[in-house]
Amino acid sequence: MEGAITGNWQSRLKAFQALAVLMAAMIVVHVVNALLLGHAWDRHGIHPRGLDGLWPGVVAAPFLHISNVHLLNNLVVLAVLGGMSALVAGNRRFIAATVFVVLAGGLLTWMFARSGSHIGASGLAFGYFGFLVGQGLFRQSLVTLLVATAVTFFYGANIFFGIAFPKGCTSWEAHLAGALAGLAYARLEVWMQRRR
């Protein structure tokens, strides 16, 4: 059974590389969308309960950002929480967690969010938060408990206030959906490993 912290540094390095590629793709998509297309791709975000908002919205939403500030804010949090997730998980688990959070969090947003176009990578960032907290809750090793405690200490209030008191057009639903998806993936992963 794979441990709470992957011992293979090559796997961790590959996970960091995967995160860097993901973040670079977000930058490229934003530059093309903003500078060349006048944000035309923004219409491909998640549009709740409409078939046109399910595909490609669930997959496209994390790559679309309303402004440079929106993108930069998400990249900073992704670098920290995604980096910690990469360190804890290693390559395979990190990629699996990322895909699960994007799909499950996006689907939950599509099912339950208010009308509008939900775009941005903050749902994924909240998913990494949920994944890290879930590692501490469900694995219960000293290292994962310390990581979960640190993440909760540094980001917990921000996460809580981002969901409870959203600003303007902030998609608190995507934040909550991402956090729940991250927690669910952490639980599912531990359950699957114990069944082996």
Residue ranges and their predicted role:
Residues E2-R196:
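A detector for small-residue-rich transmembrane helices and their helix-helix packing motifs
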